[in-house]
Amino acid sequence: PVAGEENQYIAYVAYPLDLFEEGSVTNMFTSIVGNVFGFKALRALRLEDLRIPTAYVKTFQGPPHGIQVERDKLNKYGRPLLGCTIKPKLGLSAKNYGRAVYECLRGGLDFTKDDENVNSQPFMRWRDRFLFCAEALYKAQAETGEIKGHYLNATAGTCEEMMKRAIFARELGVPIVMHDYLTGGFTANTSLAHYCRDNGLLLHIHRAMHAVIDRQKNHGIHFRVLAKALRMSGGDHIHSGTVVGKLEGERDI
């Protein structure tokens, strides 16, 4: 029973390992939470945690690189890396967006980033944004003598289009791309993570849509589970909101 709650119980469920496809977060989630949440016998259900056997974890590639490789790429050690999201995130032309990126990087930031829904809209197509951001990046690098980065959002409507954007980012020579892993899907995210590892790109992850799944305390999936799934699927770091800002969170964490 759950302390202080009526008709709530904690259940521990174990599954044979052979029920799961190796290296597939998609299959793991389909098997564990794909159907049970819809059972009419349940009023609510929440997946609080997963304990994943080491033998299964080892079938996943995991993060493309990690913090040490990121610091080596940037040649920045012994301090936090400081960045910001470009605002207003929607409505700027690609040229004005690139200007904002330049001013932030020239002013001292290590990184700037696209926001989660900056994809390829009529006012700013993705290729134009990538080109102007790369120009801003290299201009700021030349003037400061530091290695800079901009998280180019490769999220797209199809996996093929997503990969096209990631490939173009690599051709421009930028150090990092980003992806919305929940709205984009685990299959797409894992494919992108594999490409990033093979081609030396860092991968930043945005958690857009997470609160639909994890915010209610008596139903859904705890974010620790979504974070474990992401670590298996692949991502070098994840957006978590500002320390004190507009997003819901526990202050003591």
Curated annotation (Swiss-Prot):
Concerning PTM, the database record says:
The disulfide bond which can form in the large chain dimeric partners within the hexadecamer appears to be associated with oxidative stress and protein turnover.
Tell me a Gene Ontology molecular-function term this record carries. magnesium ion binding
Where does the chain bind substrate? Answer: 35, 85, 89, 207, 239
Q: Which GO terms are recorded in the biological process aspect for this UniProt protein? A: photorespiration; reductive pentose-phosphate cycle
Q: Give the residues the record marks as binding Mg(2+).
A: 113, 115-116
| N6-carboxylysine: residues bearing it | 113
Q: Where is the signal peptide?
A: none
Its keywords, alphabetically, are:
Calvin cycle, Carbon dioxide fixation, Chloroplast, Disulfide bond, Extinct organism protein, Lyase, Magnesium, Metal-binding, Monooxygenase, Oxidoreductase, Photorespiration, Photosynthesis, Plastid
The record's comment on cofactor binding reads: Binds 1 Mg(2+) ion per subunit.
According to its UniProt record, which residues of this chain constitute the active site?
Answer: 87, 206
Write out the coiled-coil annotation as residue ranges: none
- Enumerate the residues marked as the site Transition state stabilizer: 246
Q: Which reaction does it catalyse?
A: 2 (2R)-3-phosphoglycerate + 2 H(+) = D-ribulose 1,5-bisphosphate + CO2 + H2O; D-ribulose 1,5-bisphosphate + O2 = 2-phosphoglycolate + (2R)-3-phosphoglycerate + 2 H(+)
| Enzymatic class | lyase
Required co-factors: Mg(2+)
A single GO cellular-component term from the record reads:
chloroplast
Location in the cell reads: Plastid, Chloroplast
Which family is annotated? Belongs to the RuBisCO large chain family. Type I subfamily.
Record's miscellaneous remark = The basic functional RuBisCO is composed of a large chain homodimer in a 'head-to-tail' conformation. In form I RuBisCO this homodimer is arranged in a barrel-like tetramer with the small subunits forming a tetrameric 'cap' on each end of the 'barrel'.
Kindly state the subunit structure of this protein: Heterohexadecamer of 8 large chains and 8 small chains; disulfide-linked. The disulfide link is formed within the large subunit homodimers.
Name of the protein in its database record = Ribulose bisphosphate carboxylase large chain
Supply the gene name: rbcL
